[in-house]
Amino acid sequence: MRAERLSPLLALGLLVAGIRSVHCLPENVVVKDRHRRVDGHTLASSNTDFAFSLYKQLALKDPNKNVMFSPLSVSMALAFLSLGARGPTLTEILEGLKFNPTEIQETQIHQGFQHLLQALNRPRNQLQLSVGNAMFVQEELKLLDKFIEDARVLYSSEAFPTNFRDPEAAKSLINDYVKNKTQGKIEELFKDLSPRTELVLVNYVYFKAQWKTRFDPKHTEQAEFHVSDNKTVEVPMMTLDLETPYFRDEELGCTLVELTYTSNDSALFILPDKGKMQDLEAKLTPEMLTRWRNSLQPRRIHELYLPKFSIKSNYELNDTLSQMGIKKIFTDADLSGITGTADLVVSQVVHGAALDVDEEGTEGAAATGIGIERTFLRIIVRVNRPFLIAVVLKDTQSIIFLGKVTNPSEA
């Protein structure tokens, strides 16, 4: 007899929205508690490893489709869920998140996420970033006091009584909450909910920043983007002449350009040589990302051509997570740390993401002469074929977005 047919259901919603322009926050904000960032850094390696593992699974499903997701959102939601997991279920989640339970204690992991969450949500100059968690609980469901307290203290989770026996009303309540938290970028996280649902855990991320050196819309023109050998589309192509971190990786056959936001966070664009995308994807590792970031050097790019795009994605992650070793939560889960009984299973894990990249931003005082190594070669970078993008928050080294743009003309 299959457990998932009998057990009350739990659903995870994970979402992120990101866009590119921002209104500056007051410049006299003082950042305190520097030690918290150190705790955040201890998670960076595992989170990056998880990010690339999840990316590879999503990219394999359809190599010709756009991929866009937030590793930070997915990993934080699963860590939140693990608060209530016990035994092999807990071990699977932690190992799936690329932690070694024999080397790091569960409490250290949760405290690390707690400090990371606090670091991400502190007031920042020139960046709007909001990360949060919420629980939607069936009205008569009794949660353990310890789970409620840990969810509040470690994951800053809000809790909302919900009547899942009216699934349409419950869906509207959750989707409206998500829409509000993401400034309208994610409108329908859940397309349906079972009336047997008992609990929904939601993690959201909202990111809004502007380029340090903006693209001039007057220079944006329609240009060809080569989706594949036999398919070309017309897209708005932005162009810029600037000095920015750049690296040509001859070993892997790719070009890297890092564009910074006014907040000094950055977007790393990785452009494989023609026919090299799958080879590059197979070699994505945390060590490779570290090597790339250490190899980036300021260069004058005389002509940078970058497509303007707006991509939304929605994923059901049940099968994907199972392939990554996180299986028990969907079948014979032990989530007794939530209610005291082992009768909950996860019915669905959904993830929504939205990322806009366009010309908007302020022209910041980018360093143009100090520490800049000039080159006599004229560097031209045309991002006119499928590429990878990683948006990285500088102080915590968190990958907030990771994706592949195969066709910028597809929303």
Curated annotation (Swiss-Prot):
Gene3D superfamilies per record: Alpha-1-antitrypsin, domain 1, Antithrombin, subunit I, domain 2
Superkingdom of the organism of origin: Eukaryota
Main location: cytoplasm
UniProt cross-references to InterPro entries, sorted A to Z: Serpin_CS, Serpin_dom, Serpin_fam, Serpin_sf, Serpin_sf_1, Serpin_sf_2
PROSITE patterns: SERPIN (PS00284)
Localisation per UniProt entry: Cytoplasmic vesicle, Secretory vesicle, Chromaffin granule; Secreted
PANTHER family in UniProt: ALPHA-1-ANTICHYMOTRYPSIN, SERINE PROTEASE INHIBITOR, SERPIN
Protein name (database record): Serpin A3-4
Native organism: Bos taurus
